[in-house]
Amino acid sequence: MAISAAQNPLYIGFDLSTQQLKGLVVNSDLKVVYLSKFDFDADSRGFPIKKGVITNEAEHEVYAPVAMWLQALDTVLDGLRQQGLDFSRVKGISGAGQQHGSVYWGDRAEDLLQNLDPSKSLEAQLSDAFSHPYSPNWQDASTQKECDEFDAYLGSQEALAQATGSKAHHRFTGPQILRFQRKYPDVYRHTQRISLVSSFLASLFLGRFAPFDISDVCGMNLWNIKQGAYDEKLLKLCAGSFGVDDLKRKLGPVYEDGGLNLGSIHRYYVDRYGFNPDCTIIPATGDNPATILALPLRPSDAMVSLGTSTTFLMSTPSYQPHPATHFFNHPTTAGLYMFMLCYKNGGLAREQIRDAVNDKLGSSDDVWANFDRTALQTPPLGQKADSDPMKMGLFFPRPEIVPNLRSGQWRFDYNPADGSLHETTAGWDQPLDEARAIIESQMLSLRLRSRGLTSSPGDGKPPQPRRVYLVGGGSKNKAIAKIAGEILGGSEGVYKLEIGDNACALGAAYKAVWALERSNGQTFEDLIGQRWKEEDFIEKIADGYQPGVFEKYGQAVEGFEKMELQVLQQEKK
């Protein structure tokens, strides 16, 4: 049966995050035509959750009830139907799932998935499909012991990062599975399949187990990125006495093509909602990989998410793993990697200094006005003359992971001429000098850790991103945008990306468009780049590269690295 209105097919991207499920519908021109949401706290019935999760403080566990996600999918599909979506026009479906979370399917799962009754909801039919009713959330911190084992197993954190793209983290699926099989050996024995949240979503639409996506599998500490296969040694650690073959069966295969046709939608959705039987299911990916698909991000473009935390994402052909960073396979484009940095201290650190500045200068209607003005009036690195030392600091209201430090504040003077570094507050006009220093501190850390991943844009310019895209609350701030450009560069400038909080769902929907409309060998960046109407989504908000200033910050990066090492050594003592 051909897609009705074949000239106007529609595509759905689902985003299953910690606090809500979204279903977003786009057409071939990438225009959003429908959006349906289910907020777990506001809309779910019968689950003792707060902010989408259940917390067991005693064991540092944070997890979500999987049946709640079934309830959410039932409701989101009903919402799209009520809005008037003609499901027969939907040609493809993909999704984005919160990364690292695992779902444990029981013995009867595949049978239940295959034999869904269209007169009943998913929640009514699949609540018993799981050997374990909960999925660990990325905020879970119960696996310190297992992380230590993973970090040691190949010899060092560096070796684990080299193999899998990341050192061990509490939230990563490998350490989580290791703890799970030790804590619940009987449940693990009766687990037929382990899905990631992304492949769980795809499985629901297929009516059978969907494979992991080539990018999301990199968030497990089990996939050897360079070999393009599971790491046999790490599987051995993770499987324990149950054995590697059993774990491999539970994990299932992984395919290279992010646009793979996994098969047609299950009959259940055809009969219940009127989907076309030819509607194709495309592998769902993780929420971070989906974010870089929300625009045609070119290799060496950088995306900085300035929310409560700071996340830095980049598409790069260079694989240079380090324990402080993350590398994943790119979700659509072979030969590219997604580079990611996550910081706990983002907006909170800036707001603390903003409030101190307002206390000193008096507050106005615009709470950021004093902060912005002060930051822009302060010369780069607080240097009134080139012979003055550079002022730099670390400002962590909460413990940080990059670098691994307690909460605190440290201020230094750095002299690039002789490389000397002194911890001091002398010469600092507190808190006014800190308005610029906090932005510089956050951006210098990004520049330090993304060194070697960019190339020269030509014209004799130093290596830097082509464009820097800012998203999230901090992107509205003029001082942050200007200073970000001065430090990170951006041969074409700094842009504000306006896609609200729908980036993951958009990226998933675009992935479905690309998978089903690409010509032979056409890349995601090429197809989406041709159709993406730049003026609808982005606005240039600052210059990027500025000769002289960029190079001065290049010198500052050396001092910044020394400062971090010195503070780390002091804290060890």
Curated annotation (Swiss-Prot):
The keyword Hydrolase does not apply. GO terms for cellular component: cytosol. This is Probable D-xylulose kinase A. Signal peptide: none annotated. Belongs to the FGGY kinase family. The keyword Flavoprotein does not apply. It is an enzyme of class 2 (transferase). It catalyses: D-xylulose + ATP = D-xylulose 5-phosphate + ADP + H(+). Its EC number is 2.7.1.17. PANTHER family: SUGAR KINASE, XYLULOSE KINASE. ATP binds at W368, G473, G474, N477. Highly specific D-xylulose kinase which participates in the catabolism of xylose. Xylose is a major component of hemicelluloses such as xylan. Most fungi utilize D-xylose via three enzymatic reactions, xylose reductase (XR), xylitol dehydrogenase (XDH), and xylulokinase, to form xylulose 5-phosphate, which enters pentose phosphate pathway. GO terms for molecular function: ATP binding; D-xylulokinase activity. Keywords: ATP-binding, Carbohydrate metabolism, Cytoplasm, Kinase, Nucleotide-binding, Transferase, Xylose metabolism. InterPro entries: ATPase_NBD (IPR043129), D-XK_euk (IPR042024), FGGY_C (IPR018485), FGGY_N (IPR018484). Pfam families: FGGY_C (PF02782), FGGY_N (PF00370). It is found in: Cytoplasm. Substrate binds at H100, R171, D287, N288. One of its GO terms (biological process) is D-xylose metabolic process. Disulfide bonds: none annotated. Induction: By D-xylose, L-arabinose or L-arabitol. It comes from Aspergillus terreus (strain NIH 2624 / FGSC A1156).
